[in-house]
Each structure stands twice: as C-alpha cells, then as structure tokens.
Design a protein with these regions (language model features):
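C-terminal beta-signal and terminal closure region of outer-membrane beta-barrel proteins
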Residues: 4-6, 155, 632-633, 717, ...
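Short, acidic, small-residue-rich periplasmic hinge/interaction motif at the N-terminus
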Residues: 37-116, 124
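Extracytoplasmic beta-strand/coil segments of soluble accessory domains associated
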Residues: 99, 127-173
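Surface-exposed, low-complexity loop segments enriched in small/polar and acidic residues
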Residues: 180, 272, 281-289, 338-389, ...
Length: 1024
C-alpha cells in the first residue's frame, strides 16, 4: 500500500507539472504567433510586470497611502488611450491582475521617495519602523550568540508572530533563506533599485504559500531603469561609534529599439557597530544607561512579601573579575590583579555564611546589591554588530514579442559581521586544590588552619582575551523566467513563469574561546621536579600547560595557545533553494457589474541544507574528522561539545513541496444607489514530502459605498506555515543526564539517560485563521487630500511548533499526552535509556488588535506659504497576544503590552514632509507606549502579597516605560542631477529602559528600544 501511495503521489506531481508546462507552452506559442503577425512596435510604457503580483506603475495598494510616500498613483478607473488598455494593476496580497481591482487585504506601502528621505543605509531599518512590524531582527539583535550565525541578519516579523511566520519576497519571488530557519537577509537585496515595498498585514498563504501567516513583505524593483544613479553616505553616533560608509550605484540601458534592456547595480556598506563594554557597569564610549537592572528572587512565596524585587546594581556572587572563593570556611576571599587575597565586598549587608552551599546572608538567591561590581560580565555583550556587506545585481530582459519578455537575473551578496558575547570566560563551581602552587601562601596556610584541601572557586577570567565571533553569509541567486500576455477566447491573458536557484553559505569562525578539557586540566597544577606543571599525567603528555587563574597576571603564550587553540570552532552551512512557478491570469467573463478576474498556477520548491562543524564541537565523524588543525587528543571528548560556548554540530535534511492555486474576483454590484462591491476568493492545495497535503484558502470582499470616498473591506483566511529545515532536521546534540526521574515505576526511580536534542521529521504545518475587517476613507469631497483607514485583525495559530524539556516530555506522556510517548525509551532491551528533545505541534497563539492609518496632503499656497505638505501617521494597537503552551497544567500568557517582548500595546509612526522647490524637509516621530515586564506578575508590597506561584509570581513593581524618538532630516538639490541630504535619528538622544531579567545580562530589549542614541546621517546622490 505504501508503494502504491508513493507511485500515485509521484504521478500526481508529474501531471501537475506537465499541466503547468503545457499552459506555458501554449502561452509562448500564442505570443510567438503574435510576433509573426508583424514586427514589434516600441511601447511607450513598460511591459507587464515580471512577477505575478507587481504593477508596472508604483501604486499604493491601500488608498490611505499618499502619493508622496507610495509614488504616483495611476488612474485605475480610466484606461489610457491606445490599443493596449493600459498596464495591469496588481496588488501584493492577491494574484489578480485587473484594472480597478481593490484587494480586501490591507497593504501598507513605502515608496522610493520615502525610502530615500529616511536616509537609512539598509532599507530594512525604514520598513521595521512601521507599527505592524514587531520583533524583527537586525544588527542590534543576536549579539550574544556564538553559533547561530544570525548576527546582523535583517529579517521581518509582522504582528509579533516571528520572522518564520512572515514571508519576504523579491519581485514576488521567494528568496533562499540566510539560515536554516528559512528567513532571508534583506541586506542582501539590490537596494538602490527598489521601487517600493509593499507590506501585506494579513494572511496570504492562499496566494503565496507557506510562511505568510503574519503577512508578506514584498520588495519591488525597477525592472526598466534607464540611466545612471549613485549614492554615497556616511554617518556616526553622537558617541563617535557605529561609523557608516555606504556606496551604491546602478545603471540601466535599452537596446534594439527598446526590446533588450540591461541593468546592473552594486553596493558596499560598512557599519562599524557599537562594541561591548568591559566588566562592571561601564558601557562603550560613554553611554550611561546600563545599571545591571535585575529581578532578584527573594525565595519567599508565602510570607506576605513580593517574591521578586527590581534591583539596580545587582551582582552575582559566584565569581569576581580576578577570582573568588565561593564556599566553605574561606568563602568571601577575593583576589586582586596581583593575586593578593582580600575580603570581598558583597554589598547590601552581605556576609558569607562559609558553608558548603555558598550561602551569603543578607543577600538574595544568587545576588547581592551594590558592593564590588567590577567582575560583572553583563555589559560585555556587543551592543550592535559591525557589518560589512556587498552585493551585485544584474538583470537582462528581452521582448521577444510585444508585451512578452524573457529575462534572467543574478544576485551575489556577502555579509560579514562579528560580535563579542561576553568578556573573558566566566567560570563558577571550580574546585581548586589548596596545594596548587598558584594559590598564595597565606591562603594555603588558611586552608591548613581550616582543615581543608580544596575550595570552591569562581572567576570572570578577565586574564583571557574576549571571545570573538565571525559569521559570514554569502548568497548566490539566479532567476530565469518569462512573462507577458496573449489573446485567447476573445480576451487577454497574462502569464508569468520563473525558475529560481539560490545558494546561501554561512561560515562561522570563533576566536579566543576556551577548549574546556584543556582549561580544566590547565588550572589543576602541581610541582614536579621543581617545575609547575599540569597535575594530570595524560594531559601533560598531550601538551598541557598550567594556567594561573588566581589574580590578573599575564598568561604565557604557550599556556594561552593550549587553553585557547589557534583554530577555534567553525561551522559551515550550505543551503539551497530551487523554486519553479507558472501562473496565468485574465478576465474570461464580463458581468453587468464588471469583468470576472481569474488567476491560477502551479509551484514547486525544494529546500535542502547540510552543516559541517569541527570535530571538537561536533564530535569525530566522517564529515568532521581529526586533522592538522584539530588533532586527536586523549583529553578531548570524541563525542563533541568541548568548547566553552556554542553548539557546533553536523546535520542535513531536505524536503520538497508542490502546490496548485487559484484565485477569483467577482464584481457583483455596481450602481449609483448602492455603490460597487466584489468578492475575492483564493484556494491553494499543497503537498509536502514530509507532512502530506494541506489546504489554504481566503475569502474576502470590498464595498465602495454610495458615500463617495468610503470603502468597507473584509477578509478571512486559513493560512499555513510548514516546519522549516531547522525544526525538521536539527543537527543532533547529545548529553548525559544523571538522576533523571522515571514516573512509570513505583516508587519513582532515578536513572541515567542520554538526552538527544534532534529534529522531528513528523512535524505538521502550523495552521492559522486570520480575519480582518476595515473601513477606508479616501479623498472625499468634504475632505480633499485626506485619507484614512481603520482595520481590526484577529489571528489564531494552532499547532504551533514548540519544544519541551526532557523531564516534562516524559511526565506528560505519563499523564496521557500520547503524542509525546514515542520520543523516549526508559527501558531499552539494550543500551542506555534515552529521551529525544524534539519540537511538537502543541502550542497555540492568539493575537488581536487594530491598525490605524491617516494622511493629509495640501498645497501651502492656500495659507500663503510655498510648497506642499504631507502628513502621515500609522498606529497599531495590540489588544491581545496570548501564547498557550498546550500542555496540561500550563497557563496561557498574554504578552500584549509587555515591553520586555515584541508587542507593546501601542506603536506609532508619524511623518511630516515639506517639499518646496529644491528643498525637502522631513520630521518623523517613533513611539511605543508604556508597558510592563510581564502580565503574569502580581504587583504587591510587603505585608499584603498573596501566595506567589510559578504562573503568577508576586513582584514589587511592574512598570516598563515606552520610548519616544524624534528624527529630523532634509535634502537640497544642487542641480537637476546632484542632491545633498542629511538626517538625525533620535535627535534628543533618548536612552532605552532596562529590561530586567532574573540573571545578569545586557538587560535591554534591543528588538524594541533604540540603544544607539543620536545618529547623524549625511550623503550625496547623483542621478542622470
């Protein structure tokens, strides 16, 4: 039966592909016939777009978007004169090609004018300022990572649903992912040729396929650019860092009477980044807002006082900059830079208990407040990753018949970044022998007096160089396709087909990182024949050199090269994406209320990856053998995980998908009395090689009411997100867990298990229901120049892919959650019991809120001033963002308004532009509302607190202020070809609010708050 199933499925795929090929051959044949009928005549307008969702005119898909921001709007109600009937008008969010069609899905538009006025070196920054974008990643995120490779990766998150649930397109086409989660890097796009960016704030899986749960961000390039243009820009912060140097150029020219068009672009961008601070609380280059804000746990849950207290200047008391004895009779003995012992200042009245547990009386669990903060490592994380990016782009298009084009594009890009996760290499819980020759004599004597032979020790390891992570991402993308129109059955049909092959290579190299087995052997020193050597004879034979971690003395070169090898961890990942698409659209039928529009097509895609790591990180394997760079070493584990930080492991996987879709728009009403209305519906059937068949659909409509300028719109959809390569085929990581509880025995027993973190190839796609209702006010007679829209949205995502810890997996199976029971075997017939930590389709997300957009344009001559003024404001209010783990006993959490996350209650963007003659002036406001650390907390004061629970812990304060930023800029045209410009972001140099955690870290939400401070941009543009 399985073989029959596979054969039938394969045959079904072949039939679909054959049908698609037949459609395209018929289309090309019709076009070729048109060419035979007569020579092509040059057209004064651009041919139809090369992607099925792109208009040739830069038109707003939302009437609330003013022309100053979205580009000049075509008159969609009156076709231009001539036989062609005008270019097709297509809006992102729909595959329909029809003049005058208004999609029911809201779309926000950023045109080339607004992108230029914002003067950002990466268009990504401008787009993420839209309120509907929440939780996007960029140069200020992932700066504490050692092995993710996502440092500096620019990716969008709509509605706070995450980058993996936002589909990003280039000219309506998919782009190979920049890492194994499948999200592309916007900084690798040809940015100078971007004509506009459409942001679809609603589900679009029926039109575009997987990942379009939160919406779609579509970058639309100018495919018929003529001439030459260039841009050179620089900038830096008010602190003198993150220096920017940007060079961009593009050229385009037509040949053969306009039938052949060639365009190229290239750019180089350097952003210097903001370095990490050092130890303690000193930030880089004079920034002053960091104060080690921490939620300290009092350990009290039922004494009438808050369990958690917000404390500034918190310090972890398990280590210091140059070393601290953390338990036993010598607890509280710290060491200065010269290795001399002194009593450590714990602050907050802390007194070491000098017991085996390392308790500090007068302090909180794990933390004291104040005292000697010099060893804190939290601020030692890079604040913004430096980035060097370069890309080149080329496109060649040839009109083989009027309004029919074949084309090819190539895009090659590279992004280099780096970051420092933390200073030194903090170590806690170390055991140092009192006889260690590096231990000062007076401490050795104190050991003897106390009757101990060793002590517990912690250090920030300030004697070691800082970890230096270097990820490099390279992209190679090739697209070939054809699009155009032909006549069939008395009407015009538009076709579009393309094949894309994309390659992304990510290389991660880490410098200055400890090899743990070498470090552990090096710190255990002894004296042999009058020389200080490593105590372990096997390690000595393998080249061990002793390391003194007591004090801040210089580390000898041979010791440093032993504990920090010249060749640190590396990880090489190669991803490929192949995609084919063939679609057609037309108007096969005309009703009294207007033409019925139809679009349909087939798509196929294959995704694959392979990652290879070093043998010390991954373990020895065929792909990761020992070598001269990583020689065999008896002290190093052959199963991997030997480095101080990071997960470096081999892995591979692939899947393919084939899809068919159709969309129809039916105008069913058109009268002066009742206005005009249409129904838009789409469906998509998708077959994944990993999870089978799933459907997505959309139904919506618009009603242009009889009240001029007022339109109502509504849409509801079922959207999907398929599991990505990382979730399906994650590289395995294995660790041994002792004292694991087996709930299936009576009484419960403890056993040693092998914990394997792996992918789950049985994952199913996430499904979502997305509903939006809106009203649009556009240029009414009573309010000329004014446009506005209001849209309510509601999204529920089911089967959200999430991960549980090993013990919870086993416990839930015991409690009856049977889908988890295949993930472990605690009583195998042979071998070690194991638990596989995998992702499962267990959780759900619910979010709801509304978007508001308004704009006003006016000529200032009516008030006696020159020029033209445009005002635009966009706002998003998140009413709910509820995440339910979907497991027994777990409580759903609403994070709307939690400014420690991605979804503040309100987010607003306001822009005001004044254009007069050669001068253009811009003001911009960016704001999000005050919020809380988390909605799960119960605020109370000492004496009136309820019982604190894991789901609803008590806290003394729960306020997290928002941020208001003011930007100002302008440009001046020296000539028709030459323009200078300047802009200041965060004019008033507003600092972020701390985002306290229960441990010491950088403690700021870099995805939400501006952490750089005032930034100056300046540049010059040339265009002819």
């Amino acid at each position: 039966m399985e073989r029959l199933h596979m054969v039938s499925r394969s045959a079904w795929r072949r039939r679909l592909l054959a049908t698609g090929a037949g459609v395209m051959l018929a289309a090309w044949g019709s076009a070729a016939g048109a060419q035979v009928a007569g020579p092509p005549a040059p057209s004064p307008v651009s041919p139809t777009p090369t992607a099925p969702n792109l208009p040739t005119t830069t038109q707003s898909a939302d009437p609330a978007a003013p022309p100053a921001l979205a580009g000049p709007a075509a008159n969609t109600n009156t076709p231009p004169s001539g036989d062609q009937g005008g270019p097709d008008i297509v809006v992102t969010g729909s595959r329909i090609t029809s003049a005058g069609f208004n999609a029911p899905t809201p779309t926000q538009v950023l045109g080339a004018a607004q992108l230029a006025k914002n003067a950002e070196p990466n268009i990504f920054t401008t787009v993420t300022q839209l309120p509907s974008l929440q939780g996007s990643t960029g140069a200020t995120t992932n700066t504490n990572s050692t092995s993710s490779g996502q440092q500096g990766l620019s990716s969008f998150s709509l509605r706070g649903l995450g980058t993996i649930r936002t589909l990003t397109l280039l000219d309506g086409q998919r782009v190979v992912g920049a890492n194994v989660t499948g999200v592309p890097d916007i900084s690798q796009f040809p940015q100078l040729l971007v004509q506009r960016v459409d942001v679809v704030t609603g589900g679009a899986s029926a039109s575009y396929g997987s990942d379009a749960v939160g919406g779609v961000v579509n970058f639309i390039t100018d495919k018929h650019f003529e001439g030459f243009k260039a841009n050179a820009a620089g900038g830096l912060t008010t602190y003198g860092d993150d220096g920017e140097a940007l060079l961009q150029a593009a050229a385009g020219k037509s040949f053969l009477d306009g039938r052949l068009h060639v365009e190229v672009s290239g750019e180089y961008d350097h952003q210097g980044g903001v370095p990490a601070g050092g130890f303690g609380e000193q930030m880089a280059n004079g920034r002053h807002w960091y104060n080690t804000a921490t939620l300290v746990n009092t350990g009290q849950t039922n004494n009438g006082s808050p369990q958690y207290l917000l404390k500034d200047h918190a310090q972890a008391y398990q280590y210091t900059k140059y070393g601290l004895i953390t338990a036993g009779p010598l607890q509280g003995t710290a060491f200065d830079v010269n290795g001399r012992p002194f009593p450590f200042n714990y602050g907050s009245g802390g007194v070491p208990a000098r017991n085996a547990a390392g308790t500090v009386n007068g302090c909180y669990v794990g933390f004291c407040v104040g005292g000697d903060l010099s060893g804190n490592v939290g601020i030692g994380t890079t604040l913004q990753s430096p980035i060097d990016r370069a890309n080149g782009y080329g496109r060649v298009g040839f009109d083989f018949a009027p309004d029919n084009e074949i084309y090819a594009t190539v895009n090659v890009a590279q992004v280099k970044s780096s970051n420092q996760p933390n200073p030194g290499a903090s170590k806690t819980g170390l055991t140092i022998q009192c006889a260690n020759p590096f231990v000062p004599a007076e401490v050795q004597q104190a050991c003897g007096n106390a009757g101990i032979t060793s002590f517990q020790y912690g250090t920030s390891n300030a004697i070691l160089p800082n970890i230096d992570v270097h990820p490099t991402r390279k992209q190679y993308r090739f697209v070939g396709g054809a699009d155009g129109r032909f006549g069939l059955l008395g009407t015009d049909w538009h076709y579009d087909t393309y094949y894309e092959h994309g390659i992304n290579i990510t290389d991660i190299h880490v410098n200055n990182i400890l090899l743990n087995p070498h470090f552990n052997n090096a710190i255990q020193a002894t004296t042999l024949n009058g020389q200080v050597v490593c105590a372990n004879a096997t390690a000595r034979a393998a080249g061990c050199q002793p390391l003194n971690i007591i004090g801040g003395g210089a580390v000898p070169a041979d010791t440093l090269s032993y504990v920090i090898p010249e060749n640190g961890p590396f990880q090489h990942t190669r991803q490929t994406q192949d995609a084919f698409s063939a679609s057609m659209s037309g108007e096969p039928l005309t009703l009294p209320s207007g033409p019925v529009s139809l679009a349909f097509g087939l798509e196929w895609r294959r995704e694959a990856y392979k990652v290879v790591a070093d043998p010390y990180g991954n373990g020895v394997s065929d792909d990761s053998p020992y070598s001269d760079a990583y020689p065999a070493d008896p002290t190093v584990s052959t199963s991997g995980a030997n480095w101080y930080a990071g997960n470096y492991h081999d892995g591979q996987g692939k899947y393919h998908v084939i899809e068919g879709f159709a969309e129809i728009n039916v105008p069913f009403l058109k009268s002066e009395r009742f206005g005009s209305a249409n129904i838009n519906a789409a469906g998509r059937v998708t077959n994944y090689s990993t999870s089978g068949t799933i459907w997505a659909w959309k139904v919506g409509g618009t009603w242009d009411t009889p009240i001029e300028g007022i339109r109502l719109r509504a849409v509801t959809s079922k959207d999907v997100r398929a599991p990505n390569l990382s979730e399906l085929f994650a590289a395995p990581i294995s660790v041994t867990v002792p004292n694991f509880t087996n709930p299936f025995t009576t009484p419960q027993s403890q056993l040693l298990v092998l914990q394997n973190t792996i992918g789950n190839s049985a994952l199913k796609p996430e499904t979502a229901r997305n509903t939006e209702l809106g009203v649009v006010l556009s240029h009414t007679p009573l309010l000329p120049g004014f446009s506005a829209s209001f849209d309510y949205y509601r999204i529920r995502v089911n089967g959200v892919i999430s991960t549980l810890d090993a013990q919870r997996e086993v416990n839930l199976c015991y409690q009856g959650v049977t889908e988890l029971c295949s993930a472990f075997n605690l009583a195998p017939a042979s071998g070690t019991p194991y638990v596989n930590i995998q992702s499962f389709n267990l959780a759900s997300i619910f979010t709801a809120g509304f978007d508001i957009e308004a704009s006003y344009q006016m000529s200032l001559d009516r008030i006696g001033l020159p020029g033209r003024m445009t005002i635009r404001a966009l706002a998003t209010n998140v009413r709910h963002f509820i995440t339910d783990p979907g497991i027994p006993g777990a409580v759903a959490i609403d994070t709307a308004g939690a400014n420690s996350g991605n979804t503040p209650s309100w987010k607003l963007l306001g822009t005001e532009t004044w254009d007069v003659g050669k001068f253009s002036f811009l003001m911009q406001q960016r704001w999000f509302s005050d919020g809380v650390f988390g909605n799960q907390y119960v605020v109370c004061s000492a004496g009136n607190c309820p019982v604190s629970t894991a789901d609803h812990p008590t806290i003394d304060t729960n306020k997290m202020p928002g941020q208001f930023l003011f930007d100002i800029g302008g440009s001046y045209s020296l000539t028709k070809k030459l323009q200078i410009y300047a802009k200041v972001d965060n004019l008033f140099n507003k600092s972020p609010t701390g985002s306290p955690q229960t441990n010491t870290g950088i403690d700021v939400n870099q995805a939400l708050y501006d952490t750089l401070g005032r930034f100056y941009h300046f540049g010059i543009r040339y265009n002819f």
